[in-house]
Amino acid sequence: IVDNLMTKYPGIAYFKWDCNSPITNIYSPYLKDQQSHLYIEHVKGLYNVLERVKAKYPNLPMMLCSGGGGRSDYEALKYFTEFWPSDNTDPIERIFIQWGYSHFFPSKTMAAHVTSWNKNASVKFRTDVAMMGKLGFDIRIHDMTPAEQEYCKGAVKNFNRLGSAILDGDLYRLVSPYEGNHSAVMYVNEATDKAVLFAFDIHPRYAETLQPVRLQGLAPEAQYEIKEINLLPDTK
């Protein structure tokens, strides 16, 4: 199928490989030998297909979907550029999902998209949360205001500029969302001359106490310029 599509439409730039259909009614009392191996052989067969796809199209980016169905595995990283961790793209829930996911896979494998889930959350909040992984947009552009569209353009530029830190840097989990009402993570690039801090007030409350966050991973002898980014137009 992949080869047929790439032959007909060589301009295809990206594949989403979805695996949501479970295998049902697979066992039989008449087939005695090695029935318990079915899932093992199925996965081996999948890898065999992916090996052929990768050999013929080595530079084709592919996302492995069905993140909630056990498709996020280390072997698949040989063939896919990213995983879809969950169909739950509510930005508040994603703070928790991405925190847990980060204990097993690096940020560059985590497809994190801005969607229309939780429209009570601003486009800025949704985008900032998604920038902790591989940023993408699954949202109707025409439903956004001109200011929101302009904001997203700037956020994409910032993401591309800071990609070496976010996607390839060291991750520091500073404040766990599971231990309070806030969350903070930090990425530092290999040269320790660039870092990105993400800090979120998950459920803002009146007169709540905000504790300072101690940064990590920076060079102790260096001086850094701190700048807030991803601001909406006309916001200082």
Where do the model's predicted regions map?
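Active-site neighborhood of glycoside hydrolase catalytic domains
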Residues: I1-K124, D128-Q149
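Short conserved micro-motifs at the rims of enzyme active sites and ligand-binding pockets
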Residues: T115-S116, E208-Q211, K227-E228
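Aromatic- and carboxylate-lined catalytic core of secreted/periplasmic carbohydrate-active enzymes
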Residues: M132-K134, D138-V175
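Carbohydrate-binding surface patches
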Residues: S176-P220
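Solvent-exposed beta-hairpin/edge-strand motifs
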Residues: Q216-L232
